[in-house]
Amino acid sequence: MLHQPGMGIGYQPTAAMNNLLDFSKSKQAGIPISMVTCYDYWSARIISETPVDAVLVGDSASMVMHGFSSTVYAEVEMMAYHTAAVHRGLGGKFLIADLPF
C-alpha cells in the first residue's frame, strides 16, 4: 500500500463505495469520503492501490492535460477519452465523470 500523507493518525477508509447508493448512504450518515481527480491510465493505476473512495474525471482536464485557459474547451469526446483511460486503470473504484461546460 502506498504512503498516505495527510490522512492523519487513526484514519480509516470508508467501506467500499461502488455506486451512487453507497455514495448517498455515506452522505446521509455523515461519513466523510475521499475523492481525487484523475485524467490518465497510469495515475489511475496508482490510485487503484490506495484507500481513496472515489475518483473524478473533471472537465478541468481541458486545462490540466490540454493546456486550454478554461474548462469551456472540454468537449464530450475529450471527456469520454479521459474517462475511458481512467476506467481501464482504476479497477473497481467508484468513478465519477463530469460532463463538459
Q: What positions do the PLM features span?
A:
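Active-site-adjacent beta->alpha loops and helix N-cap segments on the catalytic face
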Residues: 11-21, 68-84
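Acidic (Asp/Glu)-rich catalytic clusters
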Residues: 48-49, 84-92
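Glycine-rich, proline-tolerant flexible connector loops at the mouths of alpha/beta enzymes
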Residues: 43-44, 50-80, 99-101
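A cross-domain feature marking catalytic cores of carbohydrate-active enzymes
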Residues: 37-38, 97-101
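N-terminal amphipathic alpha-helix/helix-capping segment at the start of soluble metabolic enzymes
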Residues: 2-37
